[in-house]
Amino acid sequence: MNGEQKKSTLLGPAVRRLQKELQRLVTSPADGIKVSDETCNASDLTSWKVDVTGPKETLFEGENFQLSFQFDEKYPFDSPIVTFTGDNIPKHPHVYSNGHICLSILTTDWSPALTVHSVCLSILSMLASATKKARPPDNFLYVKTCSKNPKKSSWWYHDDKV
């Protein structure tokens, strides 16, 4: 973070909360979670890139993925938009080929107590629980018809075993 104060288009509680979360992720990163250098050097807190590595002894062991977090002024009372980005989007039954993630804590089960760190851990746990590398059965149709914002999708959470 270079000790510089981050500039942001966010106000008040969102800025303070994000500064605190970023500081924690930079100084005390969890295994498999690293804030990208791009985020650490950014002048705006509304967009983060977080690099995650597939957990040991899982189908995704050692694979590197990037998550995009988009925050607005309602954070932490409203969830961020979280998607996989880049060339390596995991083939997982709850991850669409456009990077959208079907995970209830990103929408209906969001709580202000959740953090970027806890969201990343939940996503890594989701990856770790996979029993096969495959796209969701409706991937083609969903990707063709969905909004760019996954929070606008009407998710149907029905399968916690993959």
Mark where each language-model region is.
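Conserved catalytic and ligand/cofactor-coordination microenvironments
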Residues: 55, 73, 86
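Eukaryotic beta-rich interaction modules
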Residues: 27-34, 44-51
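Short, ordered beta-strand-loop transition motifs
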Residues: 36-45, 95-97
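Domain-scale recognition of soluble eukaryotic interaction modules
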Residues: 1-19, 25-26, 51, 64, ...
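Conserved, non-catalytic sequence blocks in retroelement Pol enzymes and Pol-derived host proteins
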Residues: 37-42, 55-59, 110-115
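Proline-anchored loop/turn motifs at beta-strand termini and strand-loop-strand connectors
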Residues: 70-79
